Amino acid sequence: MALTASVKDELSRLDIKKSSVRKAEVSAMLRFAGGLHIISGRIVIEAEVDLASTARRLRAAIAEVYGHQSEIIVVSGGGLRRGSRYVVRVVRDGEALARQTGLLDGRGRPVRGLPSAVVNGSAADAEAVWRGAFLAHGSLTEPGRSSSLEVTCPGPESALALVGAARRLGIQAKAREVRGVDRVVIRDGDTIATLLTRMGAHDALMVWEERRMRKEVRATANRLANFDDANLRRSAQAAVAAGARVDRALEILGDDVPDHLKYAGELRVAHKQASLDELGRLADPPMTKDAIAGRIRRLLAMADKRALDLGIPGTEANVTPEMMDE
């Protein structure tokens, strides 16, 4: 099951007893998933959601908390839409429910944000607002660099109300307008985890955290692999450059090279891409890395001094830009 669907499925099965909390959730669901329509002179409330379990939860809450009946209409997917959608419709007593849930104010005017009783409610009410908004129009992407939890909002007022509810929970969320659509977005992984916990999606959080950890381990492994590859490449480049310098050193010094330095230099030339450790093991008798490095260093210093005395190019002259290319 996709992450968004698993979160919604879990939230739709969450058992809430407190009346004020259930009211806050219903108000948010109707605000973020619904709308008011005038049909034959009567106010009808419709809320469209993407899971049958969410529709059943809303229908049950409307009946148990407010005492109004509703119906669920299944809208089959077609065109760009995949999967069925579920519309919870309240025809009879639609106006009464709209007033009770804060979709209409005392004068019968539409409320654009959330009702003040919900906005100024408890922390549990703020959690319920987020739960209802997420069930209505929320999404959660896979953890990673572009992970996000977001809710599509019916307008800027409801987006700001949702940001305010997050703030009451100590959570930072941002309201944004993207291509004319208002959204509230959370991108920080730890903050997403906190909100999932506060909403009550504990099982989904475990799945999300496991995937998050797996992504982080994989990213770390890739970084280390790239680091190792880069180090190996640089080591090989340094070895090739050293081989070219030794070639020039032997040319400059000719027969005036002490045998032990000449032997080390010839090893370097013969095995241009070998590491100093490998050169030491190839020597007969074997030498330590420091011993072979010391001999090559003295050979190069001797050759560069001779080149300076003679006024000719030193050992660096043999190192070309191509040898140092990444």
From Swiss-Prot:
GO biological process terms on file: cell division; regulation of sporulation
DNA-binding region of this protein: 275-308
Record key words, sorted: Cell cycle, Cell division, DNA-binding
Keyword check for Lipid biosynthesis: no
Functional summary from the UniProt entry: Involved in cell division and chromosome segregation.
Family, similarity comment: Belongs to the WhiA family.
HAMAP family found in the cross-reference section: HTH_type_WhiA (MF_01420)
UniProt protein name: Probable cell division protein WhiA
Source organism (scientific name): Paenarthrobacter aurescens (strain TC1)
